[in-house]
Amino acid sequence: MRSAARVLLSTFLLLAAAASAADMKLEARLVWGTDDEKGGPNCKPVDPELAAKLHGMFKWKNYFEITNQIASIPLNKTRDLKMSDHCTIRVKNLGASRVELSCLGEGKPVDQRVETLTPPKWLVWGGNSKHDTAWFVGLRSDDDKTGDAAKVVSKN
């Protein structure tokens, strides 16, 4: 009887581990690129590591983080991440580190794509804004078990 209980408990724990392994934990950041010295009242400069990577790819002098969201998305499920009053990111976990991404600007589709998120690399996409500024959305899988080692940015 005890061995049956052990087998049942082991099976339950394995199923729970497999189910959570299918969940994707990701980080999303809304970033504003500008030549202005200050961001808005709710903006803060992006961390130096991400700023260095953005400076290497884009022309703006300063990059300000507007929103930082963490989400856990079960396999084959979709989550909406409200990045600002004007920007929502819709993310569907397709499995195997693949995601279907939709960017909604003021409720209207702006861009849709399927990408692979490879920890700890950043996926960055964005567009022009008013007054020679730009917005960027940075996404990365937060499933990396190795910690913060060698975080990099990829331009897609």
Residue ranges and their predicted role:
Residues 11-12, 147:
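N-terminal compositionally biased, intrinsically disordered segments and leader/signal-like regions
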Residues 22-156:
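Outer membrane pore-forming secretion/assembly proteins and partners of Gram-negative envelopes
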Residues 1-9:
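Bacterial N-terminal signal peptides that target proteins for export
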Residues 12-20:
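Hydrophobic h-region of N-terminal signal peptides that target proteins for export
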